[in-house]
Regions:
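Charged docking surfaces used in two-component/phosphorelay signaling
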Residues: 39-47
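Receiver (REC) domain active-site loop signature in two-component systems and cognate sites
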Residues: 79, 102
Length: 147
């Protein structure tokens, strides 16, 4: 004879606010040549309520920026074709894109890198490896200022 055991599992219930979001928190263009990092950033920002587009490098970013019209660009420093520094310079030189907030994502946030970014007009830095929540908060603040 087989005996069945009954058991109960209790788990806390977490209520989420599922109200329809009529307008995104802002538009973000995520620029990174590493597909995994690019998608990680994009998905986290989408879950937070941002409208997200992606680009594979600086050249792709410059080609997409007029169409996407982002409030914030997350920009990796080390990329092929056109790196993050040159991309940021070109964004700042163009009157049509100079207002866009730029977050540099870099493994190299040494003092001279930060100084260079400040000279270019970079708005914020996030150092790799990064906490997605830190990046989200940074983007939230910049998007709020941008709108």
């Amino acid at each position: 004879m087989t005996r069945a055991r009954a058991f109960a599992v209790r788990s806390p219930c977490v209520w989420a606010n599922f109200e329809a979001v009529t307008e995104p928190l802002g538009r973000v263009l995520v620029v990174d040549d590493d597909e995994v990092i690019r998608q990680l950033i994009a998905v986290n920002l989408q879950l937070e309520g941002f409208e997200v587009a992606t680009a594979v490098d600086g050249q792709d970013c410059l080609e997409k920026v007029a169409e996407v019209r982002p409030d914030v660009i997350t920009l990796d420093v080390m990329m092929p074709r056109l790196d993050g520094w040159v991309t940021a310079i070109r964004l700042r030189e163009d009157p049509g894109t100079a207002h866009i907030r730029v977050v540099m994502i870099t493994a190299r946030a040494q003092e001279h890198d930060v100084r260079r970014g400040n000279e270019i007009g970079v708005d914020a830095y996030v150092t790799k490896p990064f906490d997605p929540n830190q990046l989200i908060q940074t983007v939230r603040k910049l998007a709020a200022v941008s709108r």
